[in-house]
Curated annotation (Swiss-Prot):
Subcellular location: Cell inner membrane
InterPro entries: GumK_N
Effect of residue 272 to A: 2-fold decrease in both affinity for UDP-GlcA and catalytic activity
Residues covered by region (Disordered): 377-400
Xref: Gene3D superfamilies: 3.40.50.11010, Glycogen Phosphorylase B
UniProt note: phenotype after gene disruption: Cells lacking this gene accumulate Man-alpha-1,3-Glc-beta-1,4-Glc-PP-polyisoprenyl, are unable to produce GlcA-Man-Glc(2)-PP-Pol, and show a decrease in xanthan production of more than 95%.
GO cellular component: plasma membrane
Function, as annotated: Catalyzes the transfer of a glucuronic acid (GlcA) residue from UDP-glucuronate to mannose-alpha-1,3-glucose-beta-1,4-glucose-P-P-polyisoprenyl to form the lipid-linked tetrasaccharide GlcA-Man-Glc(2)-PP-Pol, with a glucuronic acid-beta-mannose linkage. Is involved in the biosynthesis of the exopolysaccharide xanthan, since it catalyzes the fourth glycosylation step in the assembly of the pentasaccharide-P-P-polyisoprenyl repeating unit of xanthan. Is unable to use the trisaccharide acceptor freed from the pyrophosphate lipid moiety.
Catalytic reaction equation(s): alpha-D-Man-(1->3)-beta-D-Glc-(1->4)-alpha-D-Glc-1-di-trans,octa-cis-undecaprenyl diphosphate + UDP-alpha-D-glucuronate = beta-D-GlcA-(1->2)-alpha-D-Man-(1->3)-beta-D-Glc-(1->4)-alpha-D-Glc-di-trans,octa-cis-undecaprenyl diphosphate + UDP + H(+)
Topological category with respect to the lipid bilayer: Peripheral membrane protein
Protein name per UniProt: UDP-glucuronate:glycolipid 2-beta-glucuronosyltransferase
Length: 400
């Protein structure tokens, strides 16, 4: 049952926020939308509505499966009301152009049959945040249900990169100009957004006390390198690196893969780890690794990769594919699949100083900019259209 936001004793009503995402706020693995939601919960009543979950999710090993027993009920977690919407099936990208009419119909039906809980939460919201992906299908619904709500689109990823269905791409092109804010994690995403005046660059943030976390070191004596996350994970990197650098211990955290038979004894593989626990492994490493399996990664990852941001924050030299080196001095690029370039990049990282070159905002400052980027001129990607000077009538002009 939905509970309307209550006014505090002061009589000033706290704002009400709603986040729509294919993530769930309660999962151990955290993305940027989780940290933004943390900040929203400090500012007002906050709800998190989780989409794209059904019986099909079992086939893909969805990370929300441990929450299945709580589906279709409101659960309070760390000050946020959470709702995991489980349907019998959910729409998906069939990757078959001849099935596009069926695919479109699936998405339209899904968006047209929301649960009452979502409708109630939309009506009560002052601000609705849509994360890139399937949440796009519900923007039009939000506009109809609550025309007064501020609509914010958080582009955590480019839609073409995460292989959303054509319906979602076309729908976003249609509704983009009507949104109040489109907040991109990288300027490189702007080219595929069919709007300009409401488009801003707001990168990821870091925990305000991140530099105070992660002590003591989890490592024994010696040289240690760390890789965190599963995105496009390339085990072959560690097959090469572990043999070429036996003096380095490589720590692989949350790759989503087991131990590769080609790994040396100096590779330690960990399963999923809570975000706070990974900080020590990053903070005390000699260098960090972003082992993406291909150069065919989106250019915006140079700015948007959470692991690279955390390496940058701690001044860690980072080894990553050439495509995501970007303008960052502390990164050393290699070509995936090319052993010589992997070895050269690691050699450079081992010799590099530990210097923080990148300015990193905390999550509070980041959330300020996501909600109201116009208050921060540096976030604007396109020049503000000039205000037309008032036109004088011909009679007024002649009188001057």
């Amino acid at each position: 049952m939905s509970v309307s936001p209550a006014a505090p004793a002061s009589g000033i009503r706290r704002p009400c926020y709603l986040v729509l995402s294919a993530h769930d706020f309660r999962t151990p693995r955290r993305a940027n939308i989780h940290f933004i939601t943390d900040q929203l919960a400090l500012r007002g009543t906050t709800r998190f509505f989780s989409l794209r979950y059904s019986r099909l999710s079992r086939m893909k090993g969805d990370m929300r499966l441990p929450l299945d027993d709580t589906a279709n009920t409101v659960v309070s977690h760390n000050g946020v009301d959470c709702y995991l919407w489980r349907t019998t099936v959910h729409p998906f990208n069939t990757r078959r152009s001849w099935l596009r009419p069926v695919e479109d119909a699936m998405f339209r039906w899904y968006a047209a049959h929301p649960p009452k809980q979502l409708l109630d939460w939309m009506r009560e919201s002052d601000v609705i945040v849509f994360e890139s992906g399937i949440a796009v299908a519900f923007i039009e619904l939000a506009k109809r249900v609550n025309p007064a709500a501020k609509l914010v689109y958080r582009a955590s990823d480019g839609l073409s990169t995460i292989n959303v269905a054509s319906y979602i791409e076309r729908e976003f092109d249609r509704v983009a100009p009507t949104l109040d804010v489109i907040a991109l994690v990288s300027p490189a995403m702007a080219a595929e957004v069919a709007s300009r005046d409401n488009v801003f660059h707001v990168g990821h943030g870091v925990d305000h006390n991140l530099d105070q976390l992660g002590d003591p070191s989890p490592y024994a004596e010696g040289i240690h390198a760390v890789a965190v996350g599963s995105m496009l994970f390339d085990p072959e990197f560690f097959v090469v690196a572990s043999k070429a650098f036996p003096q380095v211990t490589f720590h692989v955290i949350g790759s989503g893969m087991g131990r590769h038979p080609g790994y040396g004894d100096n590779v330690i593989v960990y399963g999923e780890m809570k975000h706070a626990q990974t900080i020590g492994y990053i903070k005390h490493a000699r260098f960090g690794i972003a082992p993406y399996a291909s150069e065919q990664v989106p250019v915006y990852l140079a700015d948007s990769s959470m692991k690279l941001l955390q390496y940058d924050f701690f001044g860690l030299p980072a080894v990553c594919p050439n495509a995501v080196v970007g303008p960052y001095k502390s990164r050393f690029g290699y070509t995936p699949g090319n052993a010589d370039s992997v070895i050269a990049a690691i050699t450079q990282a081992l010799e590099a100083p530990r210097v923080r070159y990148r300015q990193c905002l905390n999550w509070s400052d980041t959330t300020d900019r996501v909600l109201d980027p116009r208050a921060y001129p540096e976030t604007r990607l396109y020049p503000h259209p000039p205000t037309a000077a008032p036109q004088l009538s011909s009679e007024a002009a002649l009188s001057h």
